[in-house]
Amino acid sequence: MEKIVVKGGTPLIGEVQVSGAKNAALPILAAGLLATEGTSKFYNVPKLSDIKTIGLLFESLGVKVDYKPEENTLEMDARKPLLTEASFEFVSKMRASFLVLGPMLAREGSAKVAMPGGCSIGSRPIDQHLKGFEALGATIIQDAGFVEARAEKELEGTTIFFDFPSVGGTQNVIMASCLAKGKTTIVNAAQEPEIEDMINFLIKMGAKIEGKGTSVLVIEGVEKLVGTEYTVMPDRVEAATYMIAAAATKGDVLVKGAPYKDNVALVSKMREMGVNIEVVDETSMRVSNKLDSLRPVDVKTLPHPGFLTDMQSIMCVLTLLADGTSTITETVFENRFMHVEELRRMNAKIRIEGRSSLIEGLPHLEGTTVRATDLRSGAALVIAGLMATGITKVIDIYHIDRGYVDIEEKMRKLGADIQRIDE
């Protein structure tokens, strides 16, 4: 069984290049299914197991895929008619696989997809996806762990109001609307940078979309979309991970691929704690911290432009350096404090009250064996290991591999005493 072994006590110093964003790459690749003419080639595609999984899913639908992880490229040819059933084998492994439903429905008028999988961080309902498809004219059938969408005639544009700004729902409905007849307006759409990135790709393919970066999107359906080339945005959660690791180890790291505009909430909270952050240019920030203790902080996760839920477990580790009690409130998912029990094993003083975790700062963290319960908790535990006395072993690191490219190698180049072992 593979594990990551960390010896704490070394400040991270140097520079690190952030990889392409998984949460942007996956929906962008799904959007590539809409291209009935030409082929698409994607750059800055991260070398991750989830990318391999979605590539295999595409191949099962009849798409030609050439994924070169070492070159960070993926080419796809989706010109042939798509098969209309997405296998449980792939969709159960990764929630983002559900994003094939919109393109399949738009192109073929029918789609059957297994209920999505992914990290066990609470209920992540698909009702907003289905509400949007029904509004466009599809009939939805849910049975035996599958969702089937059928359109007896061409999808027709309409106004869709989301009850909450669902990221996946926004992405799926945008893709379905691109080939629908007439105009579709999505009200209370999610505004995440990864959605903007997908919209930029769709526009380059020939889609007509207005309102990018706002909560109201207007999509004018077109007859066809054409394959093109596109470079995926950098991963803002990976950027946050190295920014927080630099501060937590009292280091000094230049993080390349960390645009300030995509990380405003994180930067604001880190500066509030006393961390020094310099915006070097449009895509880079330098993070340093020489303080023995930071100021406590209150954080509440919210849809963009609020504090990203994917960053809260990592932020929790940084608050362990605060002189006082910090509070992190999770409003997006109801089961995202699984990292807390593992941090307690390292001597962290954290208690849960409802949807909030209260973190008492300045414990003496001690290395031990801990389990990555999900993708982001795994990264949080690696950072905690960098802060702790002694040796920390993180097991179940397959979660980490779903979202981080060469995490131990990148940290080792910054001076961390970290290695991956198989025993």
Predicted regions and their residues:
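Short, structured segments at the rim of ligand-binding sites
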Residues: 1-423
